[in-house]
Amino acid sequence: MRFIFLIFLIFPYASVIAEENNYGPVKEKINQSKINWLLDRHNLQEARGGTTSGLEPNIDTEPSDYFLKIIDSNSKKEKDRFAILAMSGDHKANFEFTEIFGSNPNYELDNPYKSWGTETIIVIQNSENFISLQHILVMFMKDNDGNIQGPYVQKHWRQDWSYEDKNILEFQGKNKWAVKKQKNIKKSWSQAVYQVDDSPRYESYGTWVHEEGVSRWVSESTNRPLPRREHSVRNDYDLMKGVNKISVLPWGWVMEENNDKIKTPNKYVGTEYGLARYQKVKNYDFNAAHEYWNSTKDYWNTVRDKWDKTLSSNTKFCLKKLHDNNPLFIFHFSQAEEFKKDKDILAAKNNIDRTIKKFISYECNIR
């Protein structure tokens, strides 16, 4: 049986991301005025994304300890915290993104995107008003002879949750970022999403609502740069404006995205709907993820510290996409591998400072 998963060029116990064309080419667009069903159109249009034969994990349908704590707690804030912590643990993650309509009557809908991976989500910070969750992919794959290869490890994205966050980092388009003051933050939590290299991606805030069987969080509308699956194949827009809805359930959690595609400054192009489903799994070997994290976490802690200082002392900045024809993550992943060998935190800090300095500008006059 074939499965679709999130393609990365990954090596055992290493972290190097895929070339962008591995996200799949645009193959056949469809005129939206000529079809009846938008979300389920596999009979009309092939999905893009990487494909391989993988080791299917066992789905765990039992509620997690944190989900049970949501039920048992009488404190609203504690319920919020347990809902966030319930996103941690071992999961099979399925990602689906589908364009559903465009502004032009004859807008050609892009190929749907589908991928999957197995990833563990580690709680790396946990205090009363702040929780940080690090996602790490671990894949076992079947070769042409049916033999299992792996594990293949990839440091993935990170999400930070802050209670009553007064400062929200907002993407402005054109590689620009700005810190915005927020006023109506009572009992709210912000979710800040970071790239695989711990550089910022987007941030928004919302309020958790707890009901029998589910805890939900819905964000305010959020500007964000194009994800890799899009900027490698699209040049007709340069900003997403999205709303996220997170549902924490007994068997895992789901993040829905409703994303408008914008050509800055204000031209609307189209809208996509996205669904990331995280199902809890059991009896799957994630030891390689924990080994990688334990051997590199001091390096990544230093990267986060550098970004924390940058964001706390600057209200605006810009990020270059490339330096010496390489993106930021290439430098960081290479340096993390060096740190695994020599454990020289001072050298790592100097490398991190120099590297981020090459990519960041406070004058915002970069392309």
Language-model-derived ranges and their functions:
Residues 125-171, 177:
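Extended amphipathic alpha-helical segments with heptad-repeat/coiled-coil character used for oligomerization
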Residues 3-12:
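Sec-dependent N-terminal signal peptides
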Residues 18-86, 99-104, 109-112, 130-132, ...:
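Amphipathic/hydrophobic helical signal segments and adjacent flexible N-terminal regions
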Residues 109-111, 115-125, 134, 241-248, ...:
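Hydrophobic/aromatic beta-strand elements that line small-molecule binding cavities or substrate pockets
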Residues 218-270:
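Extended serine/threonine-enriched, polar tracts that run as long, contiguous segments within proteins
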Residues 85-90, 123-129, 246-253, 280-284:
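A short, structured loop/turn motif at beta-sheet edges
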Residues 180-241:
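Short helix-loop boundary/capping segments
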